[in-house]
Amino acid sequence: MSVEPSLNRAPIMERFGDTIEDLGTAHGIDVFAVPPERIVEFCRFLKEHPAMQFNFLSDICGVDHYPETPRFEAVYHLYSLPNRWRVRIKCRLGDPPEVPSVTGVWRTANWHEREAWDMYGIRFAGHPDLRRIYMWEGFEGFPQRKDFPLRGYKDKLNPFGAEGPPPTQPDLATRDIPQGRPSTPES
């Protein structure tokens, strides 16, 4: 069994310094925390730098950390085929969650970002076609958010869904999650 080579962090830390956070290694994957305003620059650097060559975007997923603040996170998984390195980038987002699109770095980000939008409501600024990918266009809310009712909402396609008044903001002190429909960002 061969040992995978270690990621050379020097070029990354030299370029980004204190603007990112090196979170170490988890399960053999190097992890960095990057603020949303630096995500495109950081991803482009990892892809284009000759010593890095992260040419494969494995996925982008959303995370809802309710009741923590900031509540949302976009997580990017990258792979360098020539170096056999894996990197996870964590990007914490406010509410409503928004981060610049990386479709200009990897075209495959298109579908990953649409999935995170559809399930969590994470808006990817500059995305060429940000619309639902799993749920139908008239669907209300984002089903992977922790404040989404387990039975969904009552409508003509789901007569057994939850009913109730429009939601209020969650009360973080009591961890009370409203039972109504979550507000959705304007298109």
Curated annotation (Swiss-Prot):
Checking InterPro entries in the record gives: NADH_DH_suC, NADH_quin_OxRdtase_su_C/D-like, NADH_UbQ_OxRdtase_30kDa_su, NADH_UbQ_OxRdtase_CS
Tell me where it mainly resides.
Answer: membrane
* Molecular functions (GO terms): NADH dehydrogenase (ubiquinone) activity; NADH:ubiquinone reductase (non-electrogenic) activity; quinone binding
Q: Where is the protein found, in the record's own terms? A: Cell inner membrane
Region entry Disordered, spans? 153-187
PROSITE patterns for the chain: COMPLEX1_30K
* A Pfam short name: Complex1_30kDa
| Protein name listed in UniProt | NADH-quinone oxidoreductase subunit C 2
Q: What organism, scientifically named, is this protein from?
A: Rhizobium etli (strain CIAT 652)
Q: What is the lineage of its organism?
A: Bacteria, Pseudomonadati, Pseudomonadota, Alphaproteobacteria, Hyphomicrobiales
